[in-house]
Amino acid sequence: MGHRGMGCAHFATMAMPLWALTFYLLVVLPVPSQTASVEVGKEERRLQDLDPKMGSEAGNTDGLSLARFGSRRHQRSTGFGHRVPIISRPVIPIELDLLMDNEDDRTMSKRFDDYGHMRFGKRGGDDQFDDYGHMRFGR
């Protein structure tokens, strides 16, 4: 009789992880993916509603939604595994950043000389005198 009770306990300990795994695969795992796809659909619909208001200047001709790639919610890992590190990208792509003209960089370069010292009292163009504020600075 003791041997029979031992078999049931052993069977129960073997069946519990199997039931837990089945429950996880059938109930827990599909729910985040379904809700994520519903949210992506809502975001795409919202972006399509905004596109006619913005006009054709957006240039989104390839049909891909940028909301899916930009939202951090869709970059999370599902389950209890390790999270994939999220690589932060700049808002402006590198190619467009090189094409943009930044006035701030030019004014900062005028305020400092080649050695990183500030130029005080510059009153003319850059070729007037190349010193730190007056003509008789050094020699």
Curated annotation (Swiss-Prot):
Residues 1-35 form the signal peptide. It is found in: Secreted. One of its GO terms (cellular component) is extracellular region. Residues 36-71, 81-109 form a propeptide. The modification Sulfotyrosine is found at Y115, Y132. It holds the Pfam family Sulfakinin. One of its GO terms (biological process) is neuropeptide signaling pathway. GO terms for molecular function: hormone activity. Its main location: secreted. The modification Phenylalanine amide is found at F80, F120, F137. Keywords: Amidation, Cleavage on pair of basic residues, Hormone, Neuropeptide, Secreted, Signal, Sulfation. Belongs to the gastrin/cholecystokinin family. Drosulfakinin-0 (DSK 0) plays diverse biological roles including regulating gut muscle contraction in adults but not in larvae. This is Drosulfakinins. It comes from Drosophila pseudoobscura pseudoobscura (Fruit fly).
